[in-house]
C-alpha cells in the first residue's frame, strides 16, 4: 500500500461518520500526499492540508492534499478529516457557516483554520488507522534557516560617532580609513553586531 492508497482507504472508513451527521461525502474524492498550493513551507501559518473543489477538476473529483511534513497517522487522519469537512460542506464555505458546525460535530477542536483532533476523535482515528496499517510515509523536512552571511562586515568607528563597515580583508590590507572629520577610525572590539 502506498501513501495515496492509505489516504483513500482512510476516506472510505471515515464516510460513515459523515453519513451519521447527514453530511455525506461526495462520491468522487482523491487524496494524495503533496505540497499545498501555497504556504506549504512557510515558517508561520504553514498549510498542512488543502481541499480543492470538484469544479477545478476535469473529472469533477474533489482533490485533497496532505502535506509531506506530516508523518504521524493520527495527525494525518485528523488533517484529512478537516479537509473532508471542506468537501462535505463545499470548499466555498471556507471556515465559516456550515464548516465549524460539522467540524465540531466530528470532533475537531481549536481555531477552525488550524483544527486538531479532540481526545474522542483521536481515539476513533486510532482505531481507523490501526485497521488500515502504518502510514507508508517518511516525513519530508525543509529547513527555513537563513543562509549564512557570506561576507562578515566589521564595525569601524570614529570618536565623532561616524560608523562604517568593512571586511577583514580590507582592514588587514589597507587598514581603517580616515574619517571625513579628519580623525583616524578604529575597528571596534567585539562582534560588531550591536548596531
Model-derived features: positions:
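Metalloprotease/metallohydrolase-associated module, dominated by Zn2+-dependent proteases
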Residues: 1-72, 91-195
Amino acid at each position: 500500500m502506498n501513501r495515496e492508497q492509505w489516504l483513500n482507504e482512510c476516506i472510505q472508513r471515515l464516510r460513515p461518520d459523515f453519513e451519521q451527521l447527514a453530511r455525506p461525502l461526495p462520491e468522487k474524492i482523491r487524496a494524495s500526499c503533496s505540497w499545498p498550493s501555497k504556504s506549504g513551507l512557510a515558517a508561520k501559518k504553514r498549510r498542512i492540508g488543502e481541499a480543492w473543489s470538484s469544479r477545478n477538476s476535469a473529472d469533477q473529483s474533489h482533490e485533497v492534499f496532505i502535506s509531506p511534513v506530516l508523518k504521524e497517522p493520527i495527525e494525518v487522519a485528523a488533517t484529512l478529516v478537516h479537509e473532508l469537512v471542506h468537501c462535505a460542506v463545499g470548499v466555498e464555505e471556507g471556515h465559516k457557516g456550515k464548516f465549524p458546525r460539522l467540524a465540531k460535530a466530528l470532533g475537531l477542536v481549536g481555531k477552525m483554520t488550524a483544527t486538531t483532533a479532540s481526545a474522542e476523535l483521536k481515539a476513533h482515528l486510532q482505531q481507523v488507522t490501526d485497521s488500515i496499517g502504518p502510514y507508508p510515509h517518511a516525513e519530508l523536512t525543509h529547513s527555513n534557516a537563513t543562509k549564512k552571511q557570506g561576507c562578515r562586515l566589521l564595525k569601524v568607528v570614529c570618536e565623532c560617532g561616524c560608523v562604517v563597515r568593512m571586511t577583514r580583508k580590507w582592514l588587514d590590507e589597507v587598514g581603517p580609513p580616515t574619517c571625513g572629520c579628519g580623525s583616524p577610525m578604529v575597528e571596534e572590539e567585539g562582534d560588531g553586531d550591536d548596531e
